[in-house]
UniProtKB/Swiss-Prot annotation:
GO terms for molecular function: proton-transporting ATP synthase activity, rotational mechanism; proton-transporting ATPase activity, rotational mechanism. The gene is atpF. Keywords: ATP synthesis, Cell inner membrane, Cell membrane, CF(0), Hydrogen ion transport, Ion transport, Membrane, Transmembrane, Transmembrane helix, Transport. Signal peptide: none annotated. Coiled coil: none annotated. The chain crosses the membrane at residues 11-31. It comes from Enterobacter sp. (strain 638). This is ATP synthase subunit b. It is found in: Cell inner membrane.
Length: 156
């Protein structure tokens, strides 16, 4: 019985120990475990949200990059059109300037040609009068000479 009383004492001590652990030790341990489980669950949920946010950000970045490339392409096309337009305008302006310069040069050539013809006519008339004076061997007065030159110029 001695052994039974020892076993009974040990059983009572064990039951008291279990009750004490259940009452004072077990609740803080369970609270710590539950707190840790909650933190882990929150961390996993946060990681999942972060992954979704990252995927969304990458999709937005890809969309913005596509939009930027499209806008850049439009700007490049507009710049090329404007460049072509400026070149066409410059060519047209250069053509007009060339036409103007050619017309001015032609007018100057025509004026110079007329002046040279008039000068040549006067010289021919003077030479003709000089030749006629030598043939006649007499001097014609200045008024008559001028009259003859004018008539000769008009005939030429």
């Amino acid at each position: 019985m001695n052994m039974n009383a020892t076993i009974l004492g040990q059983a009572i001590a064990f039951i008291l120990f279990v009750w004490f652990c259940m009452k004072y030790v077990w609740p803080p341990l369970m609270a710590a475990i539950e707190k840790r489980q909650k933190e882990i669950a929150d961390g996993l949920a946060s990681a999942e949200r972060a992954k979704k946010d990252l995927d969304l950000a990458q999709a937005n970045a890809t969309d913005q990059l596509k939009k930027a490339k499209a806008e850049a392409q439009v700007i490049i096309e507009q710049a090329n059109k404007r460049r072509s337009q400026i070149l066409d305008e410059a060519k047209a302006e250069a053509e007009q300037e060339r036409t103007k310069i050619v017309a001015q040069a032609q007018a100057e050539i025509d004026a110079e040609r007329k002046r040279a013809r008039e000068e040549l006519r006067k010289q021919v008339a003077i030479l003709a009068v000089a030749g006629a004076e030598k043939i006649i061997e007499r001097s014609v007065d200045e008024a008559a000479n001028s009259d003859i030159v004018d008539k000769l110029v008009a005939e030429l």
